[in-house]
Swiss-Prot record:
Organism taxonomic ancestry: Eukaryota, Metazoa, Ecdysozoa, Arthropoda, Hexapoda
Name of this protein: Gram-negative bacteria-binding protein 2
Result for mutant: residue 400 to M: In strain: Netherlands line N07 and Netherlands line N14
Cellular component terms per the entry's GO annotation: extracellular region
Domain GH16: 179-461
Keywords attached to this entry: Glycoprotein, Immunity, Innate immunity, Secreted, Signal
GO biological process assignments: carbohydrate metabolic process; innate immune response; innate immune response-activating signaling pathway; pattern recognition receptor signaling pathway; regulation of innate immune response
Signal sequence, start to end: 1-20
Organism: Drosophila melanogaster
Glycosylation sites: 71, 170, 177, 364
PANTHER family, sorted: GLYCOSYL HYDROLASE-RELATED, GRAM-NEGATIVE BACTERIA-BINDING PROTEIN 1-RELATED
Domain of life: Eukaryota
Family assignment from sequence similarity: Belongs to the insect beta-1,3-glucan binding protein family.
Keyword Membrane set for record: no
KW Signal (keyword) present: yes
Gene behind this protein: GNBP2
Length: 461
C-alpha cells in the first residue's frame, strides 16, 4: 500500500542508539525515463520501511510505505522529476525487530548527481498545514508510537502490526488476478458434498466487471446425453475418477445441471488469526448457496470433510422453513465453523435475521479470528461470538469464494419441511430429480443469482 501525500502528523520516532542496530546507508539512483529510486539493503530483522521525500523544503511531502524487500533491497521508486540544484530531503523509518529507527539525509542535485550535504538522525520532513505553514514530520522521542505486534501469522512469515492491512483485492483490474486466485475445477454431484453443480473456470461463470467480482451459476441446456469429462483441467485431488468424469450409461448419472465457479488463495495467501472483511451481495434463487469461507492450508480446496470457517452465508431461497416452522431463507444470516467427526458435520454457528434478503444489497461481512474467540459482524454490527471449536482451527487458512447448488449439509432433509425440496439428499437419482423439477426452481434465478464481491480485506489482529 502506498500514499503520495502526507495528510496528518505521524507520531513515529526512533532511537537508533539502542539495541545495536544502525540504519544502512541510503542508496540513490536517477532513473533514465523519469524520477529516481532510493533503497537500503535488506538485513535479517528488518520488517518494513517508511520513506519520506521533500524538495527544497516545500510542501507537501511525498511518502512511501514498503512492506517487503525485493531482490535483497527495500526499494522506493518515485516519478517526481529532479532538477539541477534541487535539494532533496530523504527521511526514513525502519522497523527492526519490533522497534522503530530513523535516518535522514539532505542531498543536492549537481549535474544529475545527488551529493550528500547533511546526514542526520534527528531531522524530520515537514508538511503543509491548513494555515499554510509547515510542521515537523517527526515528533519528540517521548511521543513515540510503536508498532504493537499482532498475533496474526501470515503465509510469507513476516511480522505484522495490529490493524495492519495484510491482504486486499478490490478487483480493480480488467480480469481476475490469476496469480492471487486459482480455480477449483471438478463436479460435486456424486461424492461427499452431493452438490448439484460442476465448478469450472469459464468466463461466463466467473468474471470481473466494473471493479466487482461476479460468480454466476448457469443452468445447463442438456444433462442426459453424452458424457462429462474435464480432462487435465480437473483439480480434484482425492477422487478424480468420480469428480473429473461422469461415464455415459450409468443408470443414475447425468451431467451437471448447473455450472458455477469456486476460487481460492491457497497458493498465494493464507493467515492464522486476523480480521477478514468481505463486501458482497449474496446470490438469490432457490437452492443456491454462497461460499465465503476459510479453510486450513493442510487441505486443498477440493478436500472432502475439510474444516471450514464460514465468514457468512444465507441461502438463496426467498421462502424456506424447517419442520418446526423456523425461517431459514435468504434473510437469515449465518457464520461460524464446521468440523467433521466420522463423516458427520459438527457446526458452531451464530445467526442474525434481517427484514430483507441478504442478496438484495451489498453488506460488509466480517470475521475476527483470535486465539480465544471468533467474532462475527455484518455492517459493523456484532451478531455473535464463538468460543467453541477453536482448537480445531490452529493453522493458517486460505480464502475460498464460490456459489454452489444444493448439498446435504447446506440443505439438510432432516431439517426441512416435507416435500419442500424437489430432490432427496443421498439418493442415486437426486440430480436427475432436481433437473426434472427445474420448472419449479429455475424461474427464481436471474441476474440476481450471481454473488457479487466488491472487495476482500484482511487485517492483522
Amino acid at each position: 500500500m502506498r500514499w503520495e501525500f502526507l495528510p496528518c502528523l505521524l507520531l513515529l520516532i526512533s532511537n537508533n542508539k539502542i539495541f545495536g542496530f544502525k540504519v544502512p546507508s541510503i542508496n540513490f539512483e536517477m532513473l533514465k525515463d523519469e524520477g529516481f529510486e532510493v533503497s537500503i539493503p535488506d538485513e535479517p530483522g528488518i520488517q518494513r520501511v517508511f520513506y519520506m521525500f521533500q524538495i527544497d523544503d516545500t510542501c507537501p511531502a511525498l511518502m512511501d510505505y514498503i512492506t517487503e524487500a525485493v531482490n535483497g533491497s527495500w526499494v522506493s521508486k518515485q516519478k517526481m522529476s529532479l532538477q539541477n540544484n534541487d535539494k532533496l530531503q530523504i527521511s526514513m523509518l525502519v522497523q527492526f525487530n519490533e522497534e522503530i529507527f530513523e535516518k535522514s539525509e539532505t542531498r543536492v542535485i549537481i549535474n544529475t548527481r545527488l551529493l550528500t550535504t547533511k546526514d542526520s538522525s534527528s531531522r524530520g520532513i515537514t508538511f503543509l498545514t491548513g494555515e499554510g505553514e509547515c510542521q515537523a514530520y517527526l515528533a519528540p522521542a517521548q511521543q513515540a508510537k510503536r508498532c504493537k505486534a499482532a498475533q496474526t501469522i501470515v503465509s510469507n512469515g513476516r511480522h505484522t502490526c495490529q490493524g495492519e492491512l495484510i491482504f486486499e483485492d478490490n478487483f480493480s483490474e480488467a480480469q481476475l488476478n490469476k496469480t492471487t486466485w486459482k480455480h477449483d475445477i471438478r463436479q460435486r454431484m456424486y461424492h461427499v458434498e452431493e452438490e448439484l453443480v460442476a465448478f469450472d473456470d469459464a468466463a461466463r461463470n466467473c468474471f470481473v466487471k466494473e471493479g466487482e467480482l461476479h460468480i454466476v451459476p448457469t443452468i445447463a441446456t442438456e444433462v442426459t446425453d453424452g458424457s462429462f469429462k474435464l480432462g487435465d483441467r480437473c483439480t480434484a485431488v482425492e477422487s478424480p475418477e468420480q469428480e473429473c468424469n461422469i461415464a455415459h450409461g450409468i443408470f443414475y448419472s447425468i451431467k451437471p445441471p448447473v455450472f458455477s465457479a469456486q476460487i481460492h488463495t491457497r497458493n498465494s495467501f493464507s493467515f492464522k488469526f486476523g480480521k477478514i472483511v468481505v463486501r458482497a451481495k449474496l446470490p438469490k434463487g432457490d437452492w443456491l448457496f454462497p461460499y465465503l469461507m476459510l479453510q486450513p492450508v493442510s487441505t486443498y480446496a477440493e478436500t472432502h470433510y475439510a474444516k471450514q470457517l464460514r465468514i457468512a452465508y444465507a441461502r438463496g431461497n426467498a421462502n424456506l422453513r424447517t419442520k418446526q416452522g423456523d425461517d431459514i431463507s435468504g434473510n437469515h444470516l449465518y457464520g461460524g465453523g464446521v468440523v467433521w467427526h466420522h463423516g458427520n458435520a459438527v457446526q458452531f454457528l451464530k445467526d442474525k435475521i434481517s427484514n430483507s434478503h441478504y442478496g438484495d444489497d451489498f453488506h460488509n461481512y466480517t470475521m475476527i479470528w483470535q486465539r480465544d474467540k471468533i467474532t462475527l459482524m455484518v455492517d459493523d454490527e456484532v451478531y455473535g461470538e464463538l468460543y467453541d471449536g477453536l482448537p480445531f482451527f490452529n493453522e493458517k487458512c486460505f480464502i475460498i469464494f464460490g456459489v454452489t447448488v444444493g448439498g446435504f449439509l447446506n440443505f439438510d432433509d432432516s431439517l426441512l419441511a416435507k416435500d419442500v425440496k424437489p430432490y432427496k439428499n443421498r439418493e442415486p437419482r437426486a440430480a436427475l430429480s432436481f433437473w426434472q423439477h427445474r420448472d419449479a426452481w429455475a424461474p427464481t434465478w436471474g441476474r440476481h443469482s450471481a454473488m457479487v464481491i466488491d472487495y476482500v480485506r484482511v487485517y492483522a489482529e
